[in-house]
């Protein structure tokens, strides 16, 4: 999108345009959040009613199974960090179910695919991407801002030349708000193992940049 203003004031004649750019980045650090929660074995027998739930599977057992699945998926122990512990009331006034959240630091999305294939979804409350990073993010920021500036100059030049004038020097540059990070991924995944491929279209970071530039207008 472009914004354009042209004016003649005591400051002289000028044109002000807004240039934008987008930079797509492949992350090299992925934070994947998994939350586990106690459950009742009867939930999965296909016949018991909720009032008949009696056999609660403890959190320690669920965590042990998750950690084993993570080892099988190639996730090292030092990449797993406990984020928080909480509880959920099964029903007001009745027994509550304890939960625990883990933050996994991964290096590529293939690890998520392997995790989804190995994990037992019973006891898994949510699985989602928490944050995407890249160690060269500042370099990408610079490239994105420069590209937005060049786009603004190109726009201003052909507009001024169309009126038989010439583009002069830069009088002002404003870096507009909302520059930067826009992760491209679903907020929360399904915990179904068949959903592994659902990440295929959500594996990049998109940074958006917007720069407003005022140029002097000169006679030909």
Language-model features, listed with the residues they occupy:
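Short, charge-dense linear interaction motifs
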Residues: 2-122, 126, 133-220
């Amino acid at each position: 999108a472009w914004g354009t203003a042209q004016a003649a004031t005591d400051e002289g004649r000028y044109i002000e345009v807004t240039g934008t750019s987008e930079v797509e980045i492949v992350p090299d650090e992925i934070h994947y959040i998994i939350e586990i929660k106690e459950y009742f074995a009867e939930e999965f027998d296909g016949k018991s009613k909720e009032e008949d739930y009696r056999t609660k599977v403890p959190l320690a057992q669920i965590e042990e199974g998750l950690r084993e699945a993570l080892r099988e998926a190639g996730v090292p122990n030092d990449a797993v960090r406990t984020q928080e512990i909480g509880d959920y009331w099964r029903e007001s006034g009745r027994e509550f179910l304890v939960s625990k959240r883990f933050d996994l630091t991964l290096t590529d999305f293939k690890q998520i695919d392997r995790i989804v294939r190995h994990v037992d979804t019973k006891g898994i409350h949510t699985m989602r991407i928490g944050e995407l990073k890249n160690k060269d993010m500042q370099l990408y920021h610079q490239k994105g801002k420069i590209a937005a500036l060049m786009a603004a100059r190109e726009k201003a030049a052909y507009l001024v030349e169309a009126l038989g004038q010439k583009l002069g020097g830069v009088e002002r540059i404003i870096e507009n708000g909302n520059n930067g990070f826009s992760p491209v991924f679903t907020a929360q995944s399904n915990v179904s193992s068949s959903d592994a491929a659902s990440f295929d279209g959500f594996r990049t970071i998109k940074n958006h940049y917007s720069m407003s530039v005022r140029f002097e207008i000169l006679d030909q």
